[in-house]
Design a protein with these regions (language model features):
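Conserved SGNH/GDSL esterase-like catalytic core that processes O-acyl groups on lipids
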Residues: 63-65, 71-157
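Short acidic/His/Gly/Ser-rich catalytic and metal-binding motifs that mark active-site loops
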Residues: 146, 184-188, 228-230
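Residue-level recognition of beta-strand->loop/alpha-helix junctions
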Residues: 109-111, 179, 222-224
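Substrate-gating cap/lid alpha-helix
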Residues: 185-222
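N-terminal secretory targeting modules
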Residues: 1-64
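A short helix->loop->beta-strand "cap" motif at the edges of active sites that frequently abuts
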Residues: 170-174
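Alpha/beta-hydrolase-fold catalytic nucleophile elbow
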Residues: 140, 178-179
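Generic structural signal for well-ordered alpha-helices
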Residues: 159-164, 205
Length: 230
């Protein structure tokens, strides 16, 4: 049986393709590219010792790596302290489980504006293997795959490849993917392009959830983007 709703949607996108192309080019030409915030992109922090019985020999380091695109890089913030990584570190510092088992927090930020899943995968291949396994890798990806209209198959394969290299090369114990933002609501994207982009982002986000659910040690985090940048 033919899905008439799907056919109607495809036909609409075909008819509006010239409008999408014009609006996309105009956005690329007119949109101001915001700089990435200033600040350190790696560091080691001594944690308050909730468990004073931990000896120097037993003291371990909690290793955090934040990877991805402009959301991870902190675009829109003035400094890294105001950005995602700057807000995440104090939360981890005050976590009782981390305090009880670790003496230090070693963190690094590996993120660049405009990076797609392919760019992130390539970056992970180029980066040297860490001396110690990464306890948590937080990953933001998908916005630029959406705007570049990556195929569904390519997106799924590259997410699978990212998971594979993160676990194999970096020894990641917990990999957390942030959800894609609601791109249809972005004021910089005019109608009808916003609906097309929003629908594409929703498809990629659904696939991301499915891939995460199929792997041990991989989680999908629905993100409140308005709150994250406030």
């Amino acid at each position: 049986m033919v899905d008439t709703n799907k056919l109607t949607s495809v036909a609409k996108d075909v008819l509006l393709a010239p409008v999408y192309l014009y609006q996309g080019r105009k956005i690329k030409r007119d949109t101001v590219r915001l700089p990435e915030p200033h600040g350190e992109r790696h560091g080691v922090i001594d944690l308050p010792q909730a468990n004073n019985e931990i000896s120097t020999q037993e003291a371990k380091t909690f290793n955090l790596m934040v990877v991805g695109d402009s959301a991870a890089a902190g675009v829109g913030s003035q400094t890294q302290q105001e950005a995602l990584v700057g807000k995440l570190i104090p939360i981890l510092e005050q976590n009782e489980a981390i305090q009880a088992n670790f003496a230090r927090l070693n963190w690094s930020l590996q993120a660049t504006t405009g990076h797609t899943s392919f760019d992130i995968l390539r970056r992970l291949y180029v980066l040297p293997a860490p001396e110690q396994p990464i306890d948590v890798m937080l990953l933001s990806v998908g916005v630029n795959d959406t705007t570049s209209n990556v195929s569904v198959h390519k997106w799924q394969q590259q997410i699978e490849d990212i998971i594979n290299i993160a676990q194999r090369k970096f020894g990641v114990r917990e990999l957390v993917f942030l959800s894609l933002p609601p791109m249809a609501q972005m004021p910089a994207i005019p109608a009808p392009l916003n609906n097309f982009v929003g629908a594409k982002a929703s498809v990629l986000d659904e696939i991301l959830q499915q891939v995460c659910a199929a792997h041990d040690g991989v989680n999908y985090m629905a993100t409140d983007f308005a709150r994250m940048i406030s």
